[in-house]
Amino acid sequence: KQNEKGKKMNIRFYNAKILTLNEQERFDIINGELWVKGDTICYVGESKNPAEICTELQMEQPAWKREIDVKGNLLMPGFKNAHAHTYMTFLRSYADDLPLQEWLYQMCFPKEDKLDTENIRPLEVLGIMEYLTSGITTSFDMCYFPPVYAQVAAQCGFRAVQVSGVNSFGGSAAVVEENYLKVNETSDLTSFMIGFHAEYTTKMELMQEIADLAHKYKSPVFLHNSETQNEVKECLERYGKTPTQLTEELGMYEYGGGGYHCVYFDDKDFEIFQKRQLTAVTCPASNLKLASGIAPLKRFVEEGIPVAIGTDGPASNNSLDMFKEMFLASALAKVREMDAECISADKILYMATTGGAHAMGLDNCDRLAA
């Protein structure tokens, strides 16, 4: 938090129920208080004499700018939206009732071609405002003009991690590198990873250049992966491999990463994600609207593959609501497996908070802890 002069604030939250993670990475709720000093949580624990807390922490008592009585309500980590196209607020409900390829190529791409560095800004501000209404405090974005979104997010005080969405219709590895350097220097709230849109929009030469960039900067790589049956089928026809197997062979994942959607995996795909500890980001509402399918969350969890949850863009979702995504992720997994106990509620909550933070490389923002 910052005050009206742009200075970081010291805030004490007390009389709160606080959602924390225990040593088994399971959620616990404690009664107590939470202190924020500047931009860092410095205490989470029982309520007691502040002087006693400061003695234990070997610190001077902060001069509080605000002391907030939470009145027994819950303090919890912000949701981490692990896949988004925030700027697509202007395409909400523009193209309903279409499968992915028609929706993308005939409806979305032509409209997106009209975007520029100025008209995209209010679209992104609108998306950030909507994120905050459902407690989303960070987005993992694939968007046009990444330096612009970094500026917008920083001005809003919103944390934004971006990944390159380059494809063979436009852009180049050189532009990806330029964006990587610019965004990572914009603000402490913004960062950028190497990636590309998808195998089906990207030629082999560009994919190899992206892999080379990932090695140069030791960056994780993310892309849309195995979202539809047709995507996997066509990749097999082109290369004799699934998108996961192809990108693994190209050396994309030496420094981690993952995929968005991950609906249609074969055994070898699961093996690669498990071995590399890649994150599968599920986007249930988007996959329903475009009739793409239901991701195999139970198997991801059983095989120890990290999972996070994303809304995807508002054009393929129609809202940016993590509560809706959590419900759908849970309910669809139960129906897919015909097993009401296949994934617990706290596991889904973990995916929407800690799982997303880990996917974005935000290990210091994954829980409420000092």
Regions found by a protein language model. Name each.
Residues 6-58:
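N-terminal metal-binding scaffold of metallo-dependent hydrolase/deaminase domains
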Residues 19-31, 290-291, 297, 357-370:
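Acidic, glycine-enriched loop/beta-strand segments at the rims
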Residues 90-122, 156-164, 229-254, 276-279, ...:
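Active-site gating loops and adjacent loop-to-helix segments of metal-dependent hydrolytic enzymes
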Residues 92-157, 178-186:
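Alpha-helical scaffold segments that flank or form the walls of functional sites
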Residues 148-263:
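Metal-coordinating catalytic core of metallo-dependent amide/deamination hydrolases
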Residues 173, 229-241, 269-273, 291-300, ...:
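Histidine/acidic-residue-rich catalytic or RNA/ligand-binding cores of hydrolases
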Residues 249-256, 298-370:
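His/Asp/Glu-enriched, well-ordered alpha-helical/loop segment
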